Amino acid sequence: MTRRRVLSVVVLLAALACRLGAQTPEQPAPPATTVQPTATRQQTSFPFRVCELSSHGDLFRFSSDIQCPSFGTRENHTEGLLMVFKDNIIPYSFKVRSYTKIVTNILIYNGWYADSVTNRHEEKFSVDSYETDQMDTIYQCYNAVKMTKDGLTRVYVDRDGVNITVNLKPTGGLANGVRRYASQTELYDAPGWLIWTYRTRTTVNCLITDMMAKSNSPFDFFVTTTGQTVEMSPFYDGKNKETFHERADSFHVRTNYKIVDYDNRGTNPQGERRAFLDKGTYTLSWKLENRTAYCPLQHWQTFDSTIATETGKSIHFVTDEGTSSFVTNTTVGIELPDAFKCIEEQVNKTMHEKYEAVQDRYTKGQEAITYFITSGGLLLAWLPLTPRSLATVKNLTELTTPTSSPPSSPSPPAPSAARGSTPAAVLRRRRRDAGNATTPVPPTAPGKSLGTLNNPATVQIQFAYDSLRRQINRMLGDLARAWCLEQKRQNMVLRELTKINPTTVMSSIYGKAVAAKRLGDVISVSQCVPVNQATVTLRKSMRVPGSETMCYSRPLVSFSFINDTKTYEGQLGTDNEIFLTKKMTEVCQATSQYYFQSGNEIHVYNDYHHFKTIELDGIATLQTFISLNTSLIENIDFASLELYSRDEQRASNVFDLEGIFREYNFQAQNIAGLRKDLDNAVSNGRNQFVDGLGELMDSLGSVGQSITNLVSTVGGLFSSLVSGFISFFKNPFGGMLILVLVAGVVILVISLTRRTRQMSQQPVQMLYPGIDELAQQHASGEGPGINPISKTELQAIMLALHEQNQEQKRAAQRAAGPSVASRALQAARDRFPGLRRRRYHDPETAAALLGEAETEF
């Protein structure tokens, strides 16, 4: 609400307060003398209200200088041939070859019941150039790999054998366009000969993979069919400005490089320029091409019949075949950019073929092919044509005109021609008029057909199109002109009606109840004050109290304002407006009848007394509204156009996820038989033994249960001991102590081993440390006169020592007595004679045994 309107409302409320202050509050009328209208309970735009006329409302005036503009078409039309090109979303595809050597180390466990693969490690290595030459020509490689890591050189040989030359053979695969050649298709997984041992087996496989790679513009990277990514442009040759984000020393180009197909081994193919990239785990190579090998545009459709409509700011290329319109944001054609020169040959060839097919009906004159770019990102190749019938009319007009210039080759104006030029406008009008011609134009030379009798479909389409647009535009122009004139007349009528009843006119304009008053040549509009709708009642009598001849011309109304308990009286106006005065009176007339509308009801007063209430629908409505009946444009079923097919959208992604996952699953299935879990393999074998032992114990009954409990107890004891030892070893102090003890035991064992070795090698020196010195003195004659004894005496002494040692052992055994086990065995022998030793009564046998016993001693 504006400041002026707020001031108007304040003045209005002040005036109402003065008026109400001057009035004396009335006592509520008895219910028998009043009637409550249903409009108090209805939602309406015109509730009961008090509208006070104020000279401080918003001021308005009616315009008297309305001008109706003229409406006319400003479009030019031209026929021609149209070719539409779209962005090429299909990536640039090219063949690549991958070289790699796969080293697979498998750890095999030789179990009791089954062998299992406990570990599998695979490494991939790139192939040097000297070996790629051999692989590309004769499909052979070396079955060994030499690598250096952290200063340590390692050599892996297939089957843990020797380095030899092996052949590559084709292998299977699932991905389309992928072909592999491998030297070793079977993994070396033979276990060792010793049971419960582990052996490591090595497999070296030379692998060549022929596949496709894809790269999208701007060619910052490309992806192979198997999912390998390379961060460089496939057109990079080491010298140009193409993208390259790989290691500088990993790329090189070889000229006149020869690569032989597997089926054509032994031939000498033509050399080519080939790029090589070392990725560390594999080597890639591909044939180098220039960027011109890829065209960024792709031909979509060619339309033989197209109408170019120039609207002033843009050109609409409308086709009848595709029911579509291509809109350009410029009216001037462009030259074909250098980046799109790849389509120039195709455009010239197609346009020439299309024009040859319709040259009997059309002529192109001196017009050339023009290119446009649409707002949707399409490139249009446009060749304007002129119907020969229209060209004939133009020639006849020029021949019959005395001041005409010498005839020239007929050609329609290009869409980029000046729209205001008179010859262009005349030519377009003649072309439209030619579509309405019903008689053929005479030929310009004998024996030549003008082609007007053929009635070509393109002329009919253009004529129908031009006629339809002309009729629609004329109809819309007439409607707009009539609408403007009607608004102008209505403005004049409303201006005159405000001189009679400004409140009604302004309320109809605002769409709600307002108070209006003319102040000279302007109108003051103010708001109305709503009353409490529930307190509004109508007096049944319209006679003036205390007078027999005077009556009210409008019924009396009792009401209260919102937030006010006082009851006031006024008179009911039109559209539920309440007047605060009772001055609308008249001389009472005999047999009078009045109808007053309040909401959706009409109150009927007969002889100035409320007679009845009827519905609003009971009174017929005077229809002053005239509806506009127009014929609508017929429906046009648009053809469904597919700019990019599903196959093109599918091929637009450089990552062929389906092929990558299929290839991965195929490779995973090849090693599924080898990938056995150690725990499962070993536990399965152990479970068989444990299950068999359990069945054996169950068959023994209580004895088996006792044995099982005993074994479980012993096993639990050992388990507790081992667990305690492990816990003690995990403790820092315990671990250090155990390590120190182990080191001490190792040192002690080494010392004892050395001493035992010396004892066995030099026993005399160990028993008599000074024997060497004594021998030296005896040899030099410096020592005392001691001479060694003879060998016979030495043997006698040794024999005496041996017998003495044996006698001491027997004496110790007799002194120790028999053991408990010996006594128990002897008691059993005495109780059971069968267990006694058999006594030999044979003298010869006894003598032989005694001889053996004496020999032992």
UniProtKB/Swiss-Prot annotation:
Glycoprotein as UniProt keyword: yes
Site feature location: Cleavage: 432-433
Region (Involved in fusion and/or binding to host membrane): 108-114, 192-200
Segments on the Intravirion face: 754-857
Disordered: region residues: 398-453, 832-857
Keyword Glycoprotein: yes
Signal peptide boundaries: 1-21
GO BP term (any one): virion attachment to host cell
InterPro entries in UniProt: Glycoprot_B_PH1, Glycoprot_B_PH2, Glycoprot_B_PH2_sf, Glycoprotein_B_ecto_C, Herpes_Glycoprot_B
Stretches in topological domain Virion surface: 22-732
Region (Hydrophobic membrane proximal region): 678-730, 709-729
Disulfide bonds, paired cysteine numbers: 51-528, 68-484, 141-206, 295-342, 551-588
Pfam family, one: Glycoprot_B_PH2
Protein family: Belongs to the herpesviridae glycoprotein B family.
Function per UniProt: Envelope glycoprotein that forms spikes at the surface of virion envelope. Essential for the initial attachment to heparan sulfate moieties of the host cell surface proteoglycans. Involved in fusion of viral and cellular membranes leading to virus entry into the host cell. Following initial binding to its host receptors, membrane fusion is mediated by the fusion machinery composed at least of gB and the heterodimer gH/gL. May be involved in the fusion between the virion envelope and the outer nuclear membrane during virion egress.
Protein name (database record): Envelope glycoprotein B
Source species of the chain: Epstein-Barr virus (strain B95-8) (HHV-4)
Gene transcribed to yield this protein: gB
